[in-house]
Amino acid sequence: MNKKKDDCGGLSLPSDSVFCSLHANDSIWQHDKKVLRGGKASRDGLEAERIAAQALEADGWQILGRRLRTSAGEIDILAEMDGLLAIVEVKYRPTLSEAAHALGPRQRKRLIAAASYVLAQHPEYGTEGVRFDVIVVDMAGQVRRITDAFRLDEEGWP
């Protein structure tokens, strides 16, 4: 498998994966122009991800990546604090309760597969553990974080 060195934080990823945007020195690089296209739902989702990333940073998390696409699936936000890696799924819905119920079993499995892929490429991530969080954002911009939304012992590694 060919690897490419991405100029987003020097991450070396297999050539079939793309970091669509990464924070580095307060800049965001857009690598996938498809992200910039789309309708209102796409724009709302991007805004929800921006709000979620800001909330994580305000709580002391380092954002390692946003909209990480792999052949196994996509991770909305990859964040780390004190060696704990958070794989974060962001959901935007009209109300917080609707957003909280928007992560089904198939999507959890894809998220786990994508996390497995990233961890295989970057074993230095998550030295103190890995957890799966969901951040829900409603139309009013209210944010709710569900930490440890699900566990691997419930789903298992792929």
Curated annotation (Swiss-Prot):
GO molecular function, one term: nucleic acid binding
Domain of life from the UniProt record: Bacteria
Matching HAMAP family: UPF0102
Family statement: Belongs to the UPF0102 family.
Name this protein carries in UniProt: UPF0102 protein GbCGDNIH1_0975
Species the sequence originates in: Granulibacter bethesdensis (strain ATCC BAA-1260 / CGDNIH1)
